Amino acid sequence: VNDCAHIEGGAASVAINSAIGLAKHYSVYLFSAVQPIDRRLEEVGVRVICIGKKDILHDENRIRAISKGLWDNETKRVFERLLATLSPVESIIHFHTWTKALTASLYAVTAKMDFKTVITLHDFFCFCPNGGFYDYQRNEICFRKPMSYSCLTCNCDVRSYPQKIWRSIRMAIQNHVMAKNKKIY
């Protein structure tokens, strides 16, 4: 699972190159949201399911971006249909990124269907609302306890305080859903 089906940064490079390498010995699927699709994936037999969404920052409809960036039932249903074709005993769902176009709603599916789930963390969004343990406004490392009152009232986000509040809501949803997964490794 990765936001993009192409390399647009370090995390996507790891996700796509891992999928290409694993495809030499295993049946590999890449579930993603943002096109284009890296043609190397299909050349080595990776089955790509790319739903063709825009990432949150580039969706012109800001209301849709704000709401679908927190929880996306449409994408969740597509992911659920994919997992219904796989065996929870024989499959591992490997998450790379889900904060630019996908959402934690996918973890609700892995929990419900009892899939083993692996997460490669490329940032700190599982632990810090702004993803960096960093106060971007003061240009210094942040030592606040994530999601504490001190954290939530601090304007530390790289973009804006409303963005920080939105990210905090997203993190609360994410942590709630991830806690339901009994097989996250």
What are these regions (language model features)?
Residues 82-102, 116-120:
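Short N-terminal targeting/anchoring amphipathic segment
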Residues 112, 140-185:
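Membrane-proximal helix-turn-helix segments that form the acceptor-binding/catalytic region
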Residues 1, 9, 96-98, 104:
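Conserved beta-strand->loop/alpha-helix structural units within folded catalytic cores of enzymes
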Residues 11, 72-75:
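Conserved donor sugar-nucleotide recognition element shared by glycan-biosynthetic enzymes
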Residues 92-94, 110-157:
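Active-site proximal beta-strand in glycosyltransferases
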Residues 1-39, 44-47, 87-89, 113-116:
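N-terminal subdomain of nucleotide-sugar transferases
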Residues 12-13, 40-45, 59-63, 105-107, ...:
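Short aromatic-enriched loop/helix-cap "lid" or pocket-rim segments at secondary-structure transitions
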Residues 25-73, 82:
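N-terminal strand-loop element at the rim of the active site
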